[in-house]
């Protein structure tokens, strides 16, 4: 239960700020429903802090829409709710979310091989998403299985945790965590050209282009702090150690972003492979060489 001081602060904030924001949203706004793409936790807390009820859900085309949704009065921030009636959700050993039930398709029409690939036992549909389930059955999505990074040391890293945290920084338009078959985790960062002028003025700096801003010490220091905060949510082996600011704009029109505003990771990595190599001082070692290095490490331990 909030302390008297916190309740007093809430009343002041409501009178001076929150009430005005709610007025912009409209007098009839009571609920906000989010789906289709992950909602950053700070945005979820912001809307909840306005006094609005935020409800999130999760589903795919193969599940006929939502298969998990939050309920009014039972909507913890960060989760996407519990299974819809008649449906069941569990996680595999590797963390992949598996679903079955009345909403789940029986298979892809006329495509038995593709059906077996996603429903090997004929019952549970393998979503390709990674997640966890709490004691009360609330599902939390933590990333995509195909996006898992395996470092040269064999550490599995889910980039979504780091990317979601960094994406909330006003200077960052897009961030992509890298490190597959590399000695450590790194990141490529594209600055937000729209937010940059306001940020520069706020910090007493002359307005300049993203390319020029990339070399400013104040910009670097701000990004360093953001990465330090993001790294607190992961282990040392999973943390970002180096990053590069790239001169790039990713949009739907140029093919780097999907219509649902998701970054096409494979295209970015292919087109910016030179920048990734620069981050690590050269291309990734051949598979045979990586295997020998891992063997030597095991012998040392």
For each predicted feature, which ranges?
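Alpha-helical "lid/cap" subdomains adjacent to substrate-binding clefts that gate access
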Residues: 1-30, 193-233
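Glycine-centered loop/turn positions within well-structured domains
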Residues: 75-78, 95-97, 106, 139, ...
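Ser/Thr-glycine-rich phosphate-binding loops at phosphate-binding pockets of nucleotides
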Residues: 59-63, 127, 151-152, 258
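Conserved C-terminal "lid"/linker of ANL adenylate-forming enzymes
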Residues: 149, 174-177, 183, 224-301
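C-terminal boundary motif of the adenylate-forming
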Residues: 130, 169-195
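Conserved ATP-binding/catalytic segment of the ANL
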Residues: 83, 87-151, 168
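Adenylate-forming
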Residues: 104, 138-167, 196-217, 236-240, ...
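Gly/Ser/Thr-rich phosphate-binding loop
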Residues: 1-75, 88, 173
